[in-house]
Amino acid sequence: QAVVTQESALTTSPGETVTLTCRSNTGAVTTSNYANWVQQKPDHLFTGLIGNTNNRAPGVPARFSGSLIGNKAALTITGAQTEDEAIYFCALWYSNRWVFGGGTKLTVLG
């Protein structure tokens, strides 16, 4: 059974760079897991940020980038803004289904 693990919470400050990661218990995350990242704002609105590991969705600011770091998928926010405070979920593809992580609550101290 695949399990996807994320940091439960991270804190950053405006203008700082922060990296959220997504780990798989089955081994290294690769491009074949097609990592997706989704943002949930406090109003419960979900926004797709990154698809297929590193493809930014249309309209997503360039400060959001996806990559593979070591054996994990990563979402990096370069120059965080207070509006980026949200819960971030990653999802990985395993042959025939998506498995979501539990989400990372990002606090941006303003």
Swiss-Prot record:
Keyword rRNA processing included in the entry's annotation? no
Gene3D superfamilies named among the record's database cross-references: Immunoglobulins (2.60.40.10)
Keywords of this entry:
Adaptive immunity, Immunity, Immunoglobulin
List, for all copies, the residue spans of the domain called Ig-like. 1-106
Q: Which domain of life is it from?
A: Eukaryota
Q: Which terms does the UniProt entry file under GO BP? A: adaptive immune response; immune response
Q: Does the keyword Transferase apply?
A: no
Name of the featured protein: Ig lambda-1 chain V region S178
Q: What's the source species for this entry? A: Mus musculus (Mouse)
* Organism classification: Eukaryota, Metazoa, Chordata, Craniata, Vertebrata
